[in-house]
Amino acid sequence: MFAVIKTGGKQYRVVANQVVRVEKIIGNAGDVVEFNDILMAGQEDNAIIGAPVVRDALVTAEIIEQARARKVIAFKKRRRQNSKRTRGHRQEVTTLRILEILTGGLKPKKAVAKSIKEEAAVLKATTQETKSAASVKKAAKKSAPQKQAAVASNSKED
């Protein structure tokens, strides 16, 4: 059985026990994630095509590692100007092992932690809580009281 999943703005054709590298997914090595955006699923001769997604379809995968892809070099040179610029970029990627592909509303065999969208929502909520806790500032202190000697010297002038 195969499935076409959508993650990170890309589409991947996956089968059970396949290892695939996708855009970064939140989670640690060993975590189990599930994909709900299944565009197509089925056998070679009998496929279900979603409009836009297949109902009651689920793909579970295990995170093998979080890594960074090879460096991509962006080099610009302006001729006769003695000007050039070199920049590098390394994309963060996640290596996954596809555990099972389920259709027809079947439940996964292994206990699945959370779906990717739920994890992202939880992460966003926790970051907002920490930002709000960090943004609470104490009021500035009033100016320091005058020293006794300065007050005494002012009263002598009178």
Curated annotation (Swiss-Prot):
| Alphabetical list of Pfam families matching this protein | Ribosomal_L21p
Keywords, ordered alphabetically: Ribonucleoprotein, Ribosomal protein, RNA-binding, rRNA-binding
Name a biological process GO annotation: translation
Which residues lie within the region annotated Disordered? 127-158
Q: Does the keyword Lyase apply?
A: no
Recall the GO molecular function terms of this protein's record.
Answer: rRNA binding; structural constituent of ribosome
Ranges of compositional bias, category Low complexity:
131-158
Q: Where is the signal peptide?
A: none
* GO CC annotations, alphabetized: cytoplasm; ribonucleoprotein complex; ribosome
Family per similarity comment: Belongs to the bacterial ribosomal protein bL21 family.
Q: What does this protein do?
A: This protein binds to 23S rRNA in the presence of protein L20.
The record's section on PANTHER family has: 50S RIBOSOMAL PROTEIN L21, LARGE RIBOSOMAL SUBUNIT PROTEIN BL21M
Q: Subunit structure, briefly?
A: Part of the 50S ribosomal subunit. Contacts protein L20.
Q: What is this protein called?
A: Large ribosomal subunit protein bL21
* Gene from which the chain derives: rplU
